[in-house]
Amino acid sequence: MWYYLIAAVIIALDQFTKYLIVKYMELGESIPLIADVFHLTSHRNMGAAFGILQNRRWFFIAITAVVVIGIVISLIRLGKKQPRASLALSFVLGGAVGNFIDRAMSGQVVDFLDFTLIHFPIFNVADMAITIGVGILLLDVFLDGKKNR
């Protein structure tokens, strides 16, 4: 049950931060928090990570729905038996649903976290959650592999 609460907190944080960006910033506006290093930049992405597959709204909605169903089924099966994998999936679930809401409502994802120093693509809380979840999942696979040797 905790895993769904974690996902819900991620979804709420993601949607709240995106709401603030849409409400208080103009599209394209950039506010330096650390000059030339990290900015809040109001951006919209109609594709996937790094802007690939632009204007494929229904494709992403369908894929995300399948992924979310798969994650929920996996959480039901794994639950407390594999807590690290379940934690990872809860992060991915929260991030996937956060971006799904954007795509379903407006056809685009609100991005705003901009590391200008390294010219990294602009991203959001949902993207961070997905990345953290995948990282935890990779760590889990690595640690389980070492344990089973």
Curated annotation (Swiss-Prot):
Matching PANTHER family: LIPOPROTEIN SIGNAL PEPTIDASE
Protein family according to the UniProt entry: Belongs to the peptidase A8 family.
Localization annotation: Cell membrane
Name by which UniProt lists this protein: Lipoprotein signal peptidase
Enzyme class: hydrolase
GO molecular function term, any single one: aspartic-type endopeptidase activity
Job of this protein: This protein specifically catalyzes the removal of signal peptides from prolipoproteins.
Catalysed reactions, as listed in the record: Release of signal peptides from bacterial membrane prolipoproteins. Hydrolyzes -Xaa-Yaa-Zaa-|-(S,diacylglyceryl)Cys-, in which Xaa is hydrophobic (preferably Leu), and Yaa (Ala or Ser) and Zaa (Gly or Ala) have small, neutral side chains
Gene for this chain: lspA
Annotated transmembrane regions: 58-78, 85-105, 122-142
Active site location: 111, 127
Gene Ontology biological process terms from the UniProt entry: proteolysis
Membrane topology qualifier: Multi-pass membrane protein
